[in-house]
């Protein structure tokens, strides 16, 4: 049960992170929509009549339409974003999600018997009935009349597309269908899954939609003030676990409804606010966004000042730099994790107080009828765009006095609790955690090492503020080192680690992935010549490293391999063997790095760092593993002469193009490779010598 909960939490983390990709598009869309609308605002035109010029107004219309089209197609963006996030960013998953979403929508429309006349008749009626119009069950999605599944439909098909990708991206098909093998198969299977999903949702979704509508009406209609308070508390409480993205998504994108001037239904607090901003009508939305501004712009920066003031005198300079950076980040952008995690683990009582104050902030903003939109977070940038530019309708100016009051509350409450309870906030620790001074280029290498190196990483990801890593053995993770490297906090849930590095988290993740893929070399492993050329560091010790023959047969030069990929040394230098037996043994002491799914090739790494590929036969990939038996697993340690693979040589001779087996050093770089043996060779005889 415990392991099941850990896996469930890990999946929730991945889904939460995946939702950030489409959400990250919204600030750009919001800026286009806001500025485009402002450029033909009557009040602004009164002060700047020159903006009434035809071309300026045309530009404003283009900007407004460009922003609006993003909000109109959020379900599609969520489908593609969810698929990309859960499939490791591979574009094929995004294409599969797009295809799947269109097919699912078309299937639901046909099964439910929805026509385009149903859509237009509702739109015409909505113009007459206004906001009293009944919630429609139908929608027009890219010209397809279908059920109104909103962003939930996008998330569902996006997750299914990602599952199809992860399951089938390396599938092998018979030779006559070879063109459709691998990643090309993913959109095809997703199409079939989408048809089934569309059929199921045709019957399941209507009662689910009724339930969501009833829940929305209950939360927003019965006691909205209490709902905003509870929303604020839960949203902040989920921040440490990285699950807040999942929680607020229904409130922002589904709950509530508004019929715009065109007669189209708009769902979700954030989307409704944008539609009302565009229509120029009084705001009724913003209840689930406005509450962030007082504590993000004023409260938390004041808390940072309190932490700085209570630090030991000899530590204030260091703490002051950290707190100033975190406070400015919170004030300007609304990214609060670097500051929140600085006291979350060392003084949880402060975070409890912060959570309660966040809930009251949402409540007070609602009671004062302050309604400000948001696309990114509640910082000063969003405050200008979605508050001050519409101050006459949003009551945005009230944020300033309320924010000042919250700044005073945060400062004095944090000061009191820190002193009264002797909390070990930054700068007050009994044992000082020394920061490790590393360069930007060295940081991802250091973080990777602190996570237990690449063999310990099962899944690597990141969102706006945190590095999310699923490890195989969390006992290998050096939490203290991560903090020394700049993580303001490290959260552990099962084997899921979250290191809070702030806005640079995604770049660290990108660089770590590049390192793990062998695309980035450590600065410590490179030297620069006087001519400015970069040389790879030595991969073997002085005296060279010997590679022994893994197969008995005839050793020949690579130029004799009837495949240009190998004969032209596109994959690296080495040698080839025409096998006489079907046994393959380890050519050195080291580790198994990779086993191809079709079992025809195996990648090894020696203790000296030599990476070797043994590719048995040519065009053996099409055999789909038939005739091959692998005797080891990935990440197994191996010793010289250990059996790695058994091959049915007669079967390979009959069904493959050739049995000749290239043995390639894939990371030789500028190293010198000397052939020690050609002609007849026995397993275990010296075959190659690698020298720097």
Swiss-Prot record:
The keyword GTP-binding does not apply. This is PTS system glucoside-specific EIICBA component. Residues 6-430 form the PTS EIIC type-1 domain. GO terms for molecular function: D-glucose transmembrane transporter activity; kinase activity; protein-N(PI)-phosphohistidine-sugar phosphotransferase activity; protein-phosphocysteine-sugar phosphotransferase activity. It is a multi-pass membrane protein. The EIIC domain forms the PTS system translocation channel and contains the specific substrate-binding site. The chain crosses the membrane at residues 15-35, 84-104, 140-160, 185-205, 215-235, 287-307, 318-338, 344-364, 370-390, 398-418. It comes from Staphylococcus carnosus (strain TM300). It comes from the Bacteria. GO terms for biological process: D-glucose transmembrane transport; phosphoenolpyruvate-dependent sugar phosphotransferase system. One of its GO terms (cellular component) is plasma membrane. Its EC number is 2.7.1.-. It holds the Pfam family PTS_EIIB. NCBIfam families: EIIB_glc, PTBA, PTS-II-BC-glcB. Residues 441-522 form the PTS EIIB type-1 domain. Residues 563-667 form the PTS EIIA type-1 domain. The active site is at residues 463, 615. The phosphoenolpyruvate-dependent sugar phosphotransferase system (sugar PTS), a major carbohydrate active -transport system, catalyzes the phosphorylation of incoming sugar substrates concomitantly with their translocation across the cell membrane. This system is involved in alpha- and beta-glucoside transport. Can also transport glucose, but not galactose, fructose, mannose, cellobiose, sucrose, maltose, lactose, melibiose and trehalose, as well as N-acetylglucosamine. It is an enzyme of class 2 (transferase). Inhibited by methyl alpha-D-glucoside, methyl beta-D-glucoside, p-nitrophenyl alpha-D-glucoside, o-nitrophenyl beta-D-glucoside and salicin, but not by 2-deoxyglucose. The keyword Phosphoprotein does not apply. It is found in: Cell membrane. The gene is glcB. Induction: Up-regulated by the antiterminator protein GlcT. Keywords: Cell membrane, Kinase, Membrane, Phosphotransferase system, Sugar transport, Transferase, Transmembrane, Transmembrane helix, Transport. PANTHER family: CYTOCHROME C-TYPE SYNTHESIS PROTEIN AND PTS TRANSMEMBRANE COMPONENT, PTS SYSTEM GLUCOSE-SPECIFIC EIICB COMPONENT-RELATED.
